[in-house]
Curated annotation (Swiss-Prot):
Name of the protein this chain belongs to: Nematocyst expressed protein 8
Its job: Probable toxin probably only used for predation.
Main location as per UniProt: other
Zinc-finger as UniProt keyword: no
PROSITE patterns membership: SHKT
GO MF annotations, alphabetized: toxin activity
Length: 313
């Protein structure tokens, strides 16, 4: 009966000592020893699709921008800086590019981290995703300075190239002051049609991930093709329309002729004394008929006289 309590006491002591020893174990150096957390089985996060983390925790002062862990390079090369965010922030902030070094700025327009590395990080969108580090160590690749302004001007914000290309330099005074290089480089761009909708001063460095307003793309639904043949309607023959008979123009009513004024009868002159009275037209016709009869009779009498005269001879 005494063996069971004794075994229980020994097991408790052994468990306590083993737990204390585990506290001194260094962080895991490979994924097989790593502590599994939600999202660890997913692939490397794409720009703008990072795990749901509190980005305000990445505000690291330059004097604290130092690596403390021994596996920082492998952690970064394997893309686990965001997957194991809490460990990376506390032990590998510099290698994971979460901050900029104290007294690490340079006035020269060049990539302090190397052109090859900076170009690769720029393609991934890290100029905006990791602004503190990239602004200090990749300013040339991130287009914060360059030959367009003869290396005389340097932008103060990693969002300047996108702001300038969108036309905000001529519509926002704060952006114009923050972006002397980009606003000169893209001075020919048309002004933005709407004001910049976000705060120019970010609340924390990693708020920079949202640069330009999003554009909603309307998706048009395409109806599924029908399996039934479409009904075809025969077009009517191209028959010319009958020509309508022309409508005769209305005949204007004739204007009434003016009624002539009555002519007054000519005055009759009184016959002169001793002159025969004027005959009427009927009397003149009768007289002419009598005269013609007399002439015919005279001619006939002449012929008879000639016949008598010849017979007497």
């Amino acid at each position: 009966m005494l063996r069971r309590p004794l075994l229980l006491v020994l097991f408790t002591v052994f468990s306590t000592l083993y737990a204390k020893d585990l506290r001194g174990v260094s962080p895991p150096t490979n994924e097989s020893e790593a502590e599994v957390s939600p999202g660890d089985d997913e692939g490397p996060p794409e720009p703008g699709n990072e795990p749901d983390v509190n980005w305000r925790t990445l505000t690291i002062d330059p004097e604290d921008c130092k690596d403390k862990g021994k596996d920082c390079e492998s952690l970064a090369d394997e893309g686990n800086c965001l997957k194991k965010l809490n460990y990376a922030v506390g032990n590998c902030p510099w290698t994971c590019r979460f901050c900029k070094k104290e007294n690490g700025d340079s006035k020269k327009c060049k990539d302090l981290a190397g052109e090859r590395h900076c170009n690769g990080w720029k393609v991934k969108g890290d100029c905006v995703r990791l602004p503190d580090y990239m602004m200090q160590n990749c300013k040339l690749s991130c287009e914060l300075c360059g030959p367009e302004t003869r290396f005389k001007y340097t932008d103060e914000d990693v969002r300047c190239p996108e702001w300038a290309q969108a036309g905000y330099c001529s519509t926002n005074t704060d952006i114009n002051l923050k972006c002397p290089h980009s606003c000169r480089k893209y001075k020919q761009r048309a002004p933005a049609s709407t004001p910049y909708p976000y705060p120019v001063e970010a609340l924390h460095p990693y708020q920079y991930r949202v640069v330009l307003p999003s554009v909603t793309i309307l998706q048009t639904t395409t109806a599924a093709p029908s399996t039934q043949p479409a009904e075809t309607t025969k077009a009517p023959p191209n028959t010319a329309a009958p020509t309508a008979a022309p409508t005769p123009a209305p005949t204007p009513a004739p204007a009434p002729a003016p009624t002539p004024a009555p002519v007054a009868p000519a005055p009759q002159t009184a016959p002169l004394a001793g002159s025969p009275p004027e005959s009427t037209p009927e009397e003149q016709d009768d007289n002419s008929a009598d005269e013609s009869t007399e002439i015919e009779a005279g001619e006939g009498g002449g012929e008879l006289c000639d016949e008598k005269h010849s017979s007497q001879q």
